[in-house]
Amino acid sequence: MTNIAILEYSLYGHINQLSRSIKKGIESVGVEVQHLRCAETLPSEVLEQMHAPPKPEDVRELTPANVNELEGFDGIMFGVSARYGGIPAQMKTIMDATGGLWQNGKLVGKTAGVF
């Protein structure tokens, strides 16, 4: 069975809502989906000052330490918001951590998409 990862970073939950809809659509055609979120890098005090809601407990956290899990997926969907025209640091941290996977060709042939 085809196995897709949806990897998101969602500070206020908007990207998470999109991710959940996309997950339902992918699953509706018989594809297995694992919903992941980037590890938060902002201190809890900053998140509180920004009035950020708690992270969803049903979405597993992907960290630089376990980023090699991406090797096991047939494809990856990236859910990212824009921060002043760039991707959030939390997503960039995960992407930077995939250097070893890239160097060893472990991401070659994987389908990818961004929303």
Could you describe each region identified by the protein language model?
Residues 1-107:
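N-terminal beta1-alpha1-beta2 submodule of the flavodoxin-like/Rossmannoid cofactor-binding fold
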